[in-house]
């Protein structure tokens, strides 16, 4: 369906209602999706997002309508959403551009002494990343949280910036969004999603120089168990993010 939509220049929203490998509890690869965003990245006119909160979806859908039916772009959107119940916060001020471009700072690190770390989460695992902040605070580590709505869009934009800089060496070099956002931050960077590690690893080449980057993901087969146990088994729960 994804490739057919690409070839036919279809427009619209393709919504996967069981985001990630731990949201719908089943077995194997068919019922626990840890790879659809890896596949969707191969379709050039498929714009993929893995949002967590309702306000993120609202911004993405609004922008999709503008691009597809206002600007008449031959693109379509792939959104993965959860069937899990959890509270949705109010939208942080000024985060719309970051939602559209693939990442924004959801929670700033608390001021104080001690080491600092940058935590990036997406989709079903963003809330595990939020929970990891509390665990790290108990160890004296301050953590900022970034919501990655689309690692694929971050990579695509960064590759285009890299290309333009190579083609126009006489002009001032542009900076990719992901590089710009993280350049003023401190400490190692840890990313966790409900997808294979290769998904979040897409941005590794575009991180600020000298930064350590570790990716947690759901490689392997799924299992029949609770979400809590699945996330522990696949090493993407709050404890694995923190420790």
Language model region names:
Residues 2-9, 208:
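Acidic (Asp/Glu)-rich catalytic clusters
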Residues 12-13, 18, 22-30, 41, ...:
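Thiamine diphosphate
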Residues 2-3, 30-38:
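Surface-exposed loop and adjacent secondary-structure segments within mature catalytic domains
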Residues 1-5, 61-64:
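Buried hydrophobic packing segments
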Residues 53:
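Ferredoxin-type iron-sulfur electron-transfer modules in oxidoreductases and energy-metabolism complexes
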């Amino acid at each position: 369906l994804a490739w057919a939509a690409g070839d036919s220049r279809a427009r619209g929203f393709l919504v996967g209602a069981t985001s990630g490998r731990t949201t719908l509890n089943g077995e194997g690869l068919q019922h626990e999706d840890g790879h659809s965003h890896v596949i969707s990245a191969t379709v050039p006119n498929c714009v993929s997002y893995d949002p967590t909160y309702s306000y993120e979806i609202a911004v993405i859908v609004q922008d999709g309508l503008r691009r597809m039916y206002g600007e008449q772009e031959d693109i379509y959107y792939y959104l993965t959403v959860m069937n899990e119940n959890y509270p949705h916060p109010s939208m942080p001020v000024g985060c719309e551009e970051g939602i559209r471009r693939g990442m924004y700072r959801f929670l700033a690190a608390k001021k104080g002494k001690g080491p600092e770390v940058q935590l990036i989460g997406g989709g079903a695992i963003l809330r595990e990343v939020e929970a990891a902040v509390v665990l790290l605070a108990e160890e004296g580590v301050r953590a900022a949280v970034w919501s990655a709505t689309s690692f694929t869009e971050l990579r695509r934009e960064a590759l285009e910036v890299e290309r333009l800089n190579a083609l126009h060496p006489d002009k001032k070099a542009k900076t990719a969004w992901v590089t710009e956002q993280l350049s003023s931050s401190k400490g190692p960077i840890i990313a966790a999603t409900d997808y294979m590690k290769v998904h979040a690893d897409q941005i590794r080449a575009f991180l600020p120089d000298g930064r350590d980057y570790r990716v947690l993901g759901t490689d392997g087969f799924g299992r029949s168990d609770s979400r809590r146990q699945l996330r522990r088994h696949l090493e993407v729960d709050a404890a694995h993010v923190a420790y």
